[in-house]
Amino acid sequence: MNLLYTLIATFFAGMGAGLGTGFAGMSAAAVISPILITFLGIDPYMAVGIALSSDVLASAFSAYTYGKNKNLDIRNGLIMMVSVLIFTVVGSYISSLVPSTTMGNFSVFMTFLLGIKFIVKPVMTTKESMGNVSARKRAIQSVLCGILIGFICGFVGAGGGMMMLLILTSVLGYELKTAVGTSVFIMTFTAFTGAASHFAIGGFPDATVWILCVIFTLVWARIAAVFANKATPKTLNRVTGVILVVLGIAVMIFSRLS
């Protein structure tokens, strides 16, 4: 495999995934997988494993950045994470009964629509209004929404991050920065679980492709997270929306090519 060609493909895969993770808590699998499959001819199962492992550090560093800026709800994030992990298994079993193309198309289409939503109808919730909800109610909501997110994450595969962002902002009433921070915090653990299982079953991936994807995704996620935490809510909504729309269209094209 030509090293320069690999470098270019992994750079753009990592850039797209990193920006999506840092700005919107998007799963790297949605961007990296189709690029690796289309341009480097990597086995789809292994491509998802590489993408999920790239997600781990990118999400962890993004969560740290959001947490440092007090834009992370760890308590409810942990509650939701348990529900997500359990019901991901349930969703994964159900997904085995449905054509994979249907699942992939759903994930990409949802990314595109969510981007349009942030542009047309920005999330302008404040932390003050978030504080009006009781801790008990928030915990119950976190469990129920975690069940829904986990099921869809297991069913769709690369749509968990987008579902988390949609539900955290639209259902739980989180302001955008806290929603993304909490989303990447949860994704750190879900991605690690997914990557470990992929490598345990499918074996270790091509070391060069794997390392390059991890590095590029981490660098761009770090850049995006720092910018996102400094941006005004209105600017962040617009930038997040544009990135999701562009990534949604790009992934649709890559999926067609593959």
Roles of regions detected by a PLM:
Residues 54, 182-198, 208-221:
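A small-residue-rich subset of transmembrane alpha-helices
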Residues 33, 53, 57-60, 112, ...:
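Alpha-helical transmembrane segments of polytopic integral membrane proteins
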Residues 23-32, 157-167:
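Transmembrane helix boundary and interhelical junction motifs in multipass membrane proteins
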